[in-house]
């Protein structure tokens, strides 16, 4: 999936995974009770922050990585009919294998 958003510095654009809609026992979960997803796919990565010498510090993730991120990290944005999450690199907890 390609998007026309370019993140700045160490920002990362993530397409959030869908929240669970049904429990293991078959009960449907109403929208207001769904857990906020903490994983998704990286769609775009900024060039990284600059250190004191002005050199770029590379970001550890790349486009296509499946990541786990902080539950309250990031900013949800709605752009061209789609929902995205913009997070800082420090809010990425792990790359899923």
Curated annotation (Swiss-Prot):
Gene3D superfamilies for this protein: GroES chaperonin (2.30.33.40)
CDD domains found in the cross-reference section: cpn10
Signal peptide (from-to): none
Cellular component terms (Gene Ontology): cytoplasm
GO molecular function: ATP binding; metal ion binding; protein folding chaperone; protein-folding chaperone binding; unfolded protein binding
Keyword ATP-binding: no
InterPro entries xrefs: Chaperonin_GroES, Chaperonin_GroES_sf, Chaprnonin_Cpn10_CS, GroES-like_sf
Keyword tags: Chaperone, Cytoplasm
SUPFAM superfamilies assigned: GroES-like (SSF50129)
Keyword presence, Chaperone: yes
BP GO annotations: chaperone cofactor-dependent protein refolding
Primary localization class, coarse: cytoplasm
Protein localization: Cytoplasm
Highest taxon of the lineage: Bacteria
Pfam family, one: Cpn10
Function: Together with the chaperonin GroEL, plays an essential role in assisting protein folding. The GroEL-GroES system forms a nano-cage that allows encapsulation of the non-native substrate proteins and provides a physical environment optimized to promote and accelerate protein folding. GroES binds to the apical surface of the GroEL ring, thereby capping the opening of the GroEL channel.
PANTHER family in the cross-refs: 10 KDA HEAT SHOCK PROTEIN, CO-CHAPERONIN GROES
Family in the record: Belongs to the GroES chaperonin family.
Subunit text: Heptamer of 7 subunits arranged in a ring. Interacts with the chaperonin GroEL.
This protein's name: Co-chaperonin GroES
Organism: Bifidobacterium adolescentis (strain ATCC 15703 / DSM 20083 / NCTC 11814 / E194a)
